């Protein structure tokens, strides 16, 4: 089973979470620019920061994906005030007819976490990716 953990290059808070998730599934976290679109993927996990500005790189990337190469997609993000960007990315995945996993993972950044992500967030991210891998392996 092939699992890819990706994050946007603008995501300074998502990178350590993506790296922890990738270690659990014995792979490496990559930016979306490093993704090999030609190889089929059983589970693609994409992480991003929530911000007030649109992320055209992320939107273009999601629009470029298809069900033949990417069988399942899961999303995770960090947000400050609200998670509107997560809702927009879910909507974009649905409009693009991608196989989006039912559960997504979001965590709220506090002022304390602006320098270092809390260990509880990283542990929860590992549990999330473990659940998604088990779902894909056992049910899809």
Indicate where each model-derived feature is located.
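Short, charged N-terminal beta->alpha structural module
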Residues: 1-26
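Short amphipathic alpha-helix with an adjacent loop that forms part of the alpha/beta core around
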Residues: 34-40
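FMN-binding flavodoxin-like domain, especially the glycine-rich phosphate-binding loop
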Residues: 22-28, 40-140
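Conserved acidic residues
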Residues: 31
């Amino acid at each position: 089973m092939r699992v890819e953990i990706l994050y946007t290059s603008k995501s300074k808070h998502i990178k350590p979470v993506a790296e922890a998730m990738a270690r659990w599934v014995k792979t490496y976290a990559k930016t979306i620019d490093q993704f090999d679109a030609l190889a089929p993927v059983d589970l693609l996990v994409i992480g991003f920061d929530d911000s007030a500005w649109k992320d055209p790189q992320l939107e273009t990337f999601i629009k470029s994906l298809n069900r033949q190469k990417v069988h399942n997609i899961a999303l995770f993000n960090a947000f400050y005030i609200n998670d509107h960007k997560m809702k927009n990315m879910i909507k974009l995945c649905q409009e693009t007819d991608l196989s989006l996993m039912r559960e997504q993972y979001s965590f709220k950044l506090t002022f304390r976490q602006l320098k270092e992500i809390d260990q509880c967030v990283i542990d929860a991210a590992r549990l999330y990716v473990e659940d998604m891998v088990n779902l894909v392996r056992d049910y899809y």
